[in-house]
Amino acid sequence: MPELPEVESLVAFLREHAVGRVVARVETPGIHVLKTYDPPPSALQGLAVTGVCRHGKFLDLDATGLHLVVHLARAGWLRWRADLPPAAPKMGKGPLGMRVHLADVTGGPMAGFDLTEAGTQKRLAVYIVRDPHDVPGIARLGIDPLAPEFTVDVLAGLLAGNRSQVKGVLTDQTCIAGLGNAYSDEVLWEVGLSPFKPAGNLTASDVARLYLAIDEVLRGAVARAEGLAAKDLKAEKKSGLRVHARTGLPCPRCGDTVREVSFAAKSLQYCPTCQTDGKPLADRRLSRLLK
């Protein structure tokens, strides 16, 4: 799933390549991706792209006051195309959900981007709104961890008295906007905390170290992706992960085997030596199979 660093990098890429262009055409071969119908996609036609920003994991393309807001969900992606085919894509065929044609006002070639989604879950979501906060997910977002307002005291307030597992608090978008499954694993490994530890049980020292780890992991990922083309961001993310998606491989810190806990639609990874005093966490999916 694209998280804060990847969306931040896509924002930077689109600021460079899309701002100043004019929306020539919007095609929605995957009509299921469109979550709003007023204004319609045709309302974007003829509007100049004036800005691009991020709200948590949401990407917001501002077309002269009308906003194309995208949530890439777990398997969605934005693919920039320097030369879009003139023929309209077939409805409902393949991974393509939306295609946005962007004209060059200086007379250069037509470019644009495709919004695609792998798999069958169909969670890629696109909203066309006059105010980004009309998108329910944006309206509910918590604080951005890269914002100046996100301080160690703010984090302490989110965790204090919270009975949820610390992993759950970190990935709750109404608490902290933009941190997801992958980078929360990285943060917890960095600070040496079990993902299952109750958030309210963290000491002041734990909270201080967790705050620094959130900042370092996210800013480090953003810095590594700086200047990369959209097509290269996935590979960069994978290469920078030290525990997430590395089940069965040695921990880069201590050499122990990275373990996994599986859930219905996702999994987390951790190092027993670094995070759980050498004790493997119960894999709930395996436990259900053995019943």
Give the ranges of each region predicted by the language model.
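Generic detection of long, well-ordered alpha-helical segments
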Residues: M1-L4, P145, E149, T203-Y211
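A cross-family signal for N-terminal binding/gating loops and helix N-caps
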Residues: M1-T116, T120-L124, K266-Y270, Q275-K291
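Basic, nucleic-acid-binding surfaces and adjacent catalytic neighborhoods in DNA/RNA-processing proteins
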Residues: V22-P39, C53, L78, V154-K291
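Phosphate/anion-contacting hairpin/loop surfaces
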Residues: L68-E190, P198
